[in-house]
């Protein structure tokens, strides 16, 4: 299976990282060594098993190019490509609220670049927000080992600035000022719904 640029898909073994004891120590002492996606996956599993929320990662659409049929009852996919997602990474339901968000990581220490956010994703977030959904970006600064929830209502200001060719990124200070910090902890790894609770409270006042 290949990405749109033709490069083959390979599982990132660094996500699980080495021995099981090392992986367990990551759970106790923070997010170092694990991807944001894996952290969110752990949290979503905890929320589901605890009857707190039902939030899932949307599957990446795949375009099948070449299929072989060695037997009538068996099909073998020889070539396929990951297509660009048309919406955001995650959605679900929490206490009657529709939750929709995109998750991104950056190695930059001072800013989050906007060039890996797509127009159709922002359009989807806008539509979900207009229907009173709880919409946001979850951004991790890998080097700083900090994670923030940035509400769509704040993000759209920075996106407009980006589309107007004024600034191509959001500084970490702007995210700290306009977002909600999500600290690492033991269980769940990223209890981002605490930040969502604050967002719901703030937006309930703003949308009145």
From Swiss-Prot:
GO terms for molecular function: endonuclease activity; magnesium ion binding; nucleic acid binding. It catalyses: Endonucleolytic cleavage at a junction such as a reciprocal single-stranded crossover between two homologous DNA duplexes (Holliday junction). Disulfide bonds: none annotated. It comes from the Bacteria. Binds 1 Mg(2+) ion per subunit. Its cofactor is Mg(2+). The record marks 104 as: Transition state stabilizer. It holds the Pfam family RecU. CDD domains: RecU-like (cd22354). It is found in: Cytoplasm. SUPFAM superfamilies: Restriction endonuclease-like (SSF52980). GO terms for cellular component: cytoplasm. Keywords: Cytoplasm, DNA damage, DNA recombination, DNA repair, Endonuclease, Hydrolase, Magnesium, Metal-binding, Nuclease. Its EC number is 3.1.21.10. Signal peptide: none annotated. Mg(2+) binds at residues 87, 89, 102, 121. One of its GO terms (biological process) is DNA repair. Belongs to the RecU family. Endonuclease that resolves Holliday junction intermediates in genetic recombination. Cleaves mobile four-strand junctions by introducing symmetrical nicks in paired strands. Promotes annealing of linear ssDNA with homologous dsDNA. Required for DNA repair, homologous recombination and chromosome segregation. This is Holliday junction resolvase RecU.
């Amino acid at each position: 299976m290949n990405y749109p640029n033709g490069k083959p898909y390979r599982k990132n073994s660094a996500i699980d990282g080495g021995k099981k004891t090392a992986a367990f120590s990551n759970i106790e002492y923070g997010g170092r060594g694990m991807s944001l996606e894996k952290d969110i996956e752990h949290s979503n599993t905890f929320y589901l098993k605890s009857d707190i929320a039902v939030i899932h990662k949307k599957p990446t659409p795949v375009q099948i190019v070449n299929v072989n049929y060695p037997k009538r009852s068996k099909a073998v996919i020889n070539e396929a490509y990951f297509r660009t997602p048309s919406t955001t990474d995650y959605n679900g339901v929490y206490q009657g609220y529709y939750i929709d968000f995109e998750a991104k990581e950056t190695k930059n220490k001072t800013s989050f670049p906007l060039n890996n956010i797509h127009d159709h994703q922002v359009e989807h977030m806008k539509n979900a927000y207009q229907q009173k959904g709880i919409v946001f970006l979850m951004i991790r600064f890998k080097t700083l080992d900090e994670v923030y929830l940035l509400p769509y209502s704040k993000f759209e200001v920075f996106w407009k600035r980006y589309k107007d060719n004024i600034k191509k990124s959001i500084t970490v200070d702007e995210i700290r000022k306009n977002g909600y910090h999500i600290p690492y902890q033991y269980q769940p790894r990223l209890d981002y719904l605490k930040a969502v609770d604050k967002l719901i409270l703030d937006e309930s006042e703003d949308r009145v």
